[in-house]
Amino acid sequence: MKANIHPAYAETTVVCGCGNTFQTRSTKPGGRIVVEVCSQCHPFYTGKQKILDSGGRVARFEKRYGKRKVGVDQVAAYPEQNNK
């Protein structure tokens, strides 16, 4: 490797918006990185994640057309289709 071309890789303190701090190594000058979200406060890691239905499309479809029953009732209702 060439000498004096690589950036300095030093200890850095990462500070989260929730107050959590931890040490890592980085090439960013200043020795301090401020982040908005970390593993201590992110909903995915804390288990408080909410799953959002995109507009309720499935629920709206089922409300309009209803759930169809597939089974003995439909087979008995259309005997001509069963003879094919």
Curated annotation (Swiss-Prot):
Supply one GO BP term.
translation
What PROSITE patterns does its record include? RIBOSOMAL_L31
**Record text on cofactor binding:** Binds 1 zinc ion per subunit.
Name of the protein in question: Large ribosomal subunit protein bL31
> What organism is the protein native to?
Mycobacterium leprae (strain TN)
Keyword check for GTP-binding = no
Q: Which domain of life is it from?
A: Bacteria
Question: Keywords, A to Z?
Answer: Metal-binding, Ribonucleoprotein, Ribosomal protein, RNA-binding, rRNA-binding, Zinc
Q: Gene that codes for this?
A: rpmE
Q: Which SUPFAM superfamilies match?
A: L28p-like
Write the lineage as a comma-separated list: Bacteria, Bacillati, Actinomycetota, Actinomycetes, Mycobacteriales
Cellular-component GO terms for this entry: ribonucleoprotein complex; ribosome
List, separated by semicolons, the cofactors it needs.
Zn(2+)
Q: Name one GO molecular function term.
A: rRNA binding
